[in-house]
Amino acid sequence: MRRTLYRLMIELTNGRFTSYILRKFAQSRLSSIIIPSYAKVFQINQDEMEKGLKEYRTLHELFTRKLKEGKRSIDTDASSIVSPVDGVFADYGPIEDAKTFDIKGKRYSIVDMLGNEERAQRYAGGTYMVIYLSPSHYHRIHSPLSGSVTERFVLGRKSYPVNAAGMEYGKEPLSKNYRSVTEVNSDGEHMALVKVGAMFVNSIELLHERDTVQKGEEMAYFTFGSTVVLLFEKDMIEVVQELKSGQELRLGEKIATRLAHK
């Protein structure tokens, strides 16, 4: 019953008009009035911001802020996979041969997430990682590895929240929400970077348009907190053992190691 009521409330409030109004407000100078309160409530680290709080003219500018030069370092080990974002490490695990994985008691289909069987087949038997970005986090997304961009595509229309309630009661938000996917071929092995939209504010702006990408290079930004899902081919990586659910991650921090193949 709670799941049904939750979904009904989301469907009634999560329409195009609501999203449009919220987006317009966030991009308006009027939104600057609540910037100080927003920064206080979400405990934004102002020491890391590229500009002072009063220099951000709208909430949108604050959401998409850049960091000061040198505030993040990218792990330089050739075999490392790095966190593409600042965020909270939610979960990782195996992708079953049936191209599904379980998180928070909910089963997700890679076929649904990527839009078709052919794309999903690459990741059967592989590994998934999920990182959640709260409204307080730096919202820009960087590449976790170097390689050639093979595909960029967008799927989904509406978005359920990706917080605890959304994960429990929503309609598989990681694979059904509005999402932007970038696939990268790195030394013959594939990785999918799935950028999942948040409720009301679906906007995910792509910044990278070249055919190649370097580890740590900026690729996109969210206009609000959301979630990133990483998919890796079978036997491609080994997740850093020290990683724990709920752990804070910083952009550029090593999260996995590429496995050597003879």
Curated annotation (Swiss-Prot):
GO terms for cellular component: plasma membrane. The modification Pyruvic acid (Ser) is found at S226. Transmembrane segments: none annotated. GO terms for biological process: phosphatidylethanolamine biosynthetic process. It catalyses: a 1,2-diacyl-sn-glycero-3-phospho-L-serine + H(+) = a 1,2-diacyl-sn-glycero-3-phosphoethanolamine + CO2. Its EC number is 4.1.1.65. It is found in: Cell membrane. It holds the Pfam family PS_Dcarbxylase. Is synthesized initially as an inactive proenzyme. Formation of the active enzyme involves a self-maturation process in which the active site pyruvoyl group is generated from an internal serine residue via an autocatalytic post-translational modification. Two non-identical subunits are generated from the proenzyme in this reaction, and the pyruvate is formed at the N-terminus of the alpha chain, which is derived from the carboxyl end of the proenzyme. Pathway: Phospholipid metabolism; phosphatidylethanolamine biosynthesis; phosphatidylethanolamine from CDP-diacylglycerol: step 2/2. The keyword Membrane applies. It comes from the Bacteria. The active site is at D86, H142, S226. Its cofactor is pyruvate. It is a peripheral membrane protein. The record marks G225, S226 as: Cleavage (non-hydrolytic). One of its GO terms (molecular function) is phosphatidylserine decarboxylase activity. InterPro entries: PS_Dcarbxylase (IPR003817), PSD-B (IPR033177), PSD_type1_pro (IPR033178). Binds 1 pyruvoyl group covalently per subunit. Belongs to the phosphatidylserine decarboxylase family. PSD-B subfamily. Prokaryotic type I sub-subfamily. Catalyzes the formation of phosphatidylethanolamine (PtdEtn) from phosphatidylserine (PtdSer). PANTHER family: PHOSPHATIDYLSERINE DECARBOXYLASE, PHOSPHATIDYLSERINE DECARBOXYLASE PROENZYME, MITOCHONDRIAL. Heterodimer of a large membrane-associated beta subunit and a small pyruvoyl-containing alpha subunit. This is Phosphatidylserine decarboxylase proenzyme. It comes from Bacillus thuringiensis (strain Al Hakam).
